[in-house]
Amino acid sequence: MPTLGVNIDHVATIRQARRTVEPDPAAAAVLVELAGADGITVHLREDRRHIQDRDVEILRRTVRTHLNLEMAATRAMVDFALDVRPDYVTLVPERREEVTTEGGLDVGGQIASVGLAVEQLQCAGIPVSLFVDPDAAQLQASARTGAKFVELHTGRYAEARGEQAQRSELAQLAAACDEAQALGLRVNAGHGLTYWNVAPVARLSGMEELNIGHSIIARAVLVGLERAVREMKQAMIAG
């Protein structure tokens, strides 16, 4: 079974809604780890709409599992990551007008800039994952950058309506998982995964980690963070 990385961005979203000091993402990370999460993920966006620089700096000192920093492949963000030194970096596409990340990184269309970011980070000992659609061309481009991992974008699977559509999207994810491994890439996945759709993705051969945020934080509003994380771990092995 893959491990579970919990994205705690939306803890910061609630805090930033009132520009106050609570809830504290670092405190949330402690509870999430105590509940059995295998890693903590945060996305430091260029517009700083939720997670702030200081959050990442504190989390780097306090997280006891591993810290995965999602970020754009810009010079400023690479410099920040080189300073903070998270355990992993996941390079993601970013548009200021989007509500959440809407698709995978176009590695093939910007292979020089992505490749440079990968080289700089990995030369500093920070393994890099590329958040990409389950597309053979993007996987091949990802391998050419030298990145250690890809994170498969599961949004189309999560949004598929009807059993046939879901099976089709799951088959694409399975094929991408196999293709990535054949190219020497390690495989994670995430985006839009919930308690109700996670198990089939968790069963894909070679899947190492699932990064899940919104569904867990939404559930935590009702039952608390620790129970929400435990329930997701159970959902990953259900079915």
From Swiss-Prot:
Binding site residues for 1-deoxy-D-xylulose 5-phosphate: D9, H10, R45, H50, T100
Positions bound to 3-amino-2-oxopropyl phosphate: N7, R18, G192, G213, H214
Active site: H43 (proton acceptor), E70 (proton acceptor), H191 (proton donor)
InterPro entries membership: Aldolase_TIM, PyrdxlP_synth_PdxJ, Pyridoxine-5'_phos_synth
Keywords associated with the record: Cytoplasm, Pyridoxine biosynthesis, Transferase
GO biological process: pyridoxine biosynthetic process
Gene Ontology terms: cellular component: cytosol
Residues at the site labelled Transition state stabilizer: E151
E.C. number: 2.6.99.2
General function of this protein: Catalyzes the complicated ring closure reaction between the two acyclic compounds 1-deoxy-D-xylulose-5-phosphate (DXP) and 3-amino-2-oxopropyl phosphate (1-amino-acetone-3-phosphate or AAP) to form pyridoxine 5'-phosphate (PNP) and inorganic phosphate.
Family: Belongs to the PNP synthase family.
HAMAP family registered for this protein in UniProt: PdxJ
Protein name: Pyridoxine 5'-phosphate synthase
UniProt organism field: Gloeobacter violaceus (strain ATCC 29082 / PCC 7421)
